[in-house]
Amino acid sequence: MEIKEDVKYLESHEWFKKEGNIGIIGISDYAQSEMGDVVFIELPEVGDEVTADKACATVESVKAVFEIISPMTGKVVEINEELLDAPEKINEDAFGSWFFKVELKGESSKLMDAGKYKGLCK
């Protein structure tokens, strides 16, 4: 299981990376391994507003449907359209398969660093 040091995490296993005023979101390697094979993903639309700690997307695997919680508040400026056609890429590379990018207005107060997240995943 890979846990990157340069991103922050929510307890619900989403990762968040900040690049200037843009936030990038995806799910952790731990999350994708627990989900099983991903078969469908529903993302917000460009222009949508997402709110920290609220559901903003869904991932369907062979096991169940999972709500994705936003680790930030802001306006969606880009989605990873490749995942809409090939959601299995999430299983192949959880950190390379970002879901969407947001122009940041705020971050969740529940974000944790890699060290704390490792403890959660044990």
Swiss-Prot record:
The keyword Protein transport does not apply. SUPFAM superfamilies: Single hybrid motif (SSF51230). Keywords: Lipoyl. Transmembrane segments: none annotated. It comes from Treponema denticola (strain ATCC 35405 / DSM 14222 / CIP 103919 / JCM 8153 / KCTC 15104). The keyword Cytoplasm does not apply. Binds 1 lipoyl cofactor covalently. GO terms for cellular component: cytosol; glycine cleavage complex. Belongs to the GcvH family. The glycine cleavage system is composed of four proteins: P, T, L and H. It holds the Pfam family GCV_H. InterPro entries: 2-oxoA_DH_lipoyl-BS, Biotin_lipoyl, GCV_H, GCV_H/Fam206, GCV_H_sub, Single_hybrid_motif. One of its GO terms (biological process) is glycine decarboxylation via glycine cleavage system. The modification N6-lipoyllysine is found at residue 63. The glycine cleavage system catalyzes the degradation of glycine. The H protein shuttles the methylamine group of glycine from the P protein to the T protein. This is Glycine cleavage system H protein. Residues 22-103 form the Lipoyl-binding domain. Its cofactor is (R)-lipoate.
